[in-house]
Amino acid sequence: MLKMNLGDTELIVATCRKYNLTAFETAYVLATAYHETAHTMKPIMELGGTTYLKGKKYWPYVGRGYVQLTWKENYIKAGKKLGVDFVDNPGLLMEAKYAAPILVLGMKEG
Protein backbone atom coordinates (compact mmCIF):
# COMPACT_ATOMS: atom_id res chain seq x y z
CA MET A 1 0.00 0.00 0.00
CA LEU A 2 1.30 3.44 -0.96
CA LYS A 3 1.69 5.78 1.98
CA MET A 4 1.00 9.47 1.42
CA ASN A 5 4.04 10.37 3.53
CA LEU A 6 6.40 8.30 1.36
CA GLY A 7 8.94 10.50 -0.41
CA ASP A 8 7.32 13.18 -2.55
CA THR A 9 3.88 11.56 -2.79
CA GLU A 10 2.06 14.65 -1.51
CA LEU A 11 3.87 16.88 -4.02
CA ILE A 12 2.99 14.54 -6.87
CA VAL A 13 -0.68 14.46 -5.83
CA ALA A 14 -0.70 18.28 -5.59
CA THR A 15 0.82 18.49 -9.07
CA CYS A 16 -1.84 16.12 -10.41
CA ARG A 17 -4.50 18.40 -8.92
CA LYS A 18 -2.82 21.49 -10.39
CA TYR A 19 -3.13 19.96 -13.86
CA ASN A 20 -6.69 18.67 -13.26
CA LEU A 21 -6.04 14.94 -13.45
CA THR A 22 -8.86 12.63 -12.46
CA ALA A 23 -8.55 10.28 -9.50
CA PHE A 24 -7.88 7.39 -11.89
CA GLU A 25 -5.19 9.34 -13.73
CA THR A 26 -3.62 10.35 -10.42
CA ALA A 27 -3.55 6.72 -9.32
CA TYR A 28 -1.78 5.78 -12.56
CA VAL A 29 0.76 8.59 -12.11
CA LEU A 30 1.46 7.49 -8.53
CA ALA A 31 1.82 3.83 -9.51
CA THR A 32 4.22 4.75 -12.29
CA ALA A 33 6.34 6.96 -10.03
CA TYR A 34 6.39 4.26 -7.35
CA HIS A 35 7.69 1.70 -9.83
CA GLU A 36 10.13 3.99 -11.67
CA THR A 37 11.73 5.33 -8.47
CA ALA A 38 12.37 1.90 -6.96
CA HIS A 39 9.56 2.55 -4.45
CA THR A 40 11.14 5.73 -3.05
CA MET A 41 8.82 8.34 -4.60
CA LYS A 42 11.92 10.55 -4.95
CA PRO A 43 13.63 11.55 -8.21
CA ILE A 44 16.37 9.05 -9.00
CA MET A 45 19.01 8.62 -11.69
CA GLU A 46 19.07 5.55 -13.89
CA LEU A 47 20.86 2.72 -12.13
CA GLY A 48 24.15 1.30 -13.30
CA GLY A 49 26.87 3.76 -12.37
CA THR A 50 28.74 6.30 -14.48
CA THR A 51 30.89 3.83 -16.42
CA TYR A 52 27.84 1.82 -17.43
CA LEU A 53 25.75 4.89 -18.25
CA LYS A 54 28.49 6.47 -20.37
CA GLY A 55 28.16 3.43 -22.63
CA LYS A 56 24.52 4.26 -23.41
CA LYS A 57 23.78 5.92 -26.77
CA TYR A 58 21.68 8.49 -24.99
CA TRP A 59 24.45 9.60 -22.56
CA PRO A 60 24.36 12.16 -20.89
CA TYR A 61 20.57 12.23 -21.22
CA VAL A 62 20.11 9.16 -19.04
CA GLY A 63 17.03 8.34 -17.02
CA ARG A 64 16.32 10.93 -14.34
CA GLY A 65 13.39 12.01 -12.24
CA TYR A 66 10.23 10.15 -11.34
CA VAL A 67 9.78 8.64 -14.82
CA GLN A 68 13.38 8.10 -15.89
CA LEU A 69 13.24 10.64 -18.72
CA THR A 70 15.84 9.68 -21.35
CA TRP A 71 17.15 10.92 -24.72
CA LYS A 72 18.04 14.48 -25.69
CA GLU A 73 14.79 14.95 -27.64
CA ASN A 74 12.77 14.31 -24.49
CA TYR A 75 14.94 16.64 -22.42
CA ILE A 76 14.28 19.34 -25.06
CA LYS A 77 10.52 18.65 -25.05
CA ALA A 78 10.32 18.77 -21.24
CA GLY A 79 12.38 21.95 -21.20
CA LYS A 80 10.03 23.67 -23.64
CA LYS A 81 7.01 22.73 -21.54
CA LEU A 82 8.56 24.13 -18.35
CA GLY A 83 10.72 26.91 -19.80
CA VAL A 84 13.92 25.34 -18.42
CA ASP A 85 17.10 24.30 -20.26
CA PHE A 86 17.42 20.64 -19.30
CA VAL A 87 19.82 19.94 -22.18
CA ASP A 88 22.58 22.08 -20.67
CA ASN A 89 21.44 21.31 -17.11
CA PRO A 90 20.30 17.67 -17.06
CA GLY A 91 20.81 17.42 -13.31
CA LEU A 92 17.82 19.72 -12.78
CA LEU A 93 15.60 16.73 -13.52
CA MET A 94 16.62 15.42 -10.11
CA GLU A 95 14.84 18.34 -8.44
CA ALA A 96 11.28 17.57 -7.38
CA LYS A 97 10.00 20.99 -8.51
CA TYR A 98 10.84 19.99 -12.10
CA ALA A 99 10.44 16.22 -11.87
CA ALA A 100 6.82 16.42 -10.66
CA PRO A 101 5.41 18.46 -13.58
CA ILE A 102 7.47 16.41 -16.04
CA LEU A 103 5.89 13.25 -14.62
CA VAL A 104 2.35 14.63 -14.63
CA LEU A 105 2.41 16.54 -17.93
CA GLY A 106 4.29 13.76 -19.66
CA MET A 107 1.63 11.26 -18.71
CA LYS A 108 -1.24 13.66 -19.39
CA GLU A 109 -0.06 15.10 -22.70
CA GLY A 110 2.63 12.72 -23.88
What are these regions (language model features)?
Residues M1-L11, A23-E109:
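Peptidoglycan-targeting cell-wall enzymes and recognition modules
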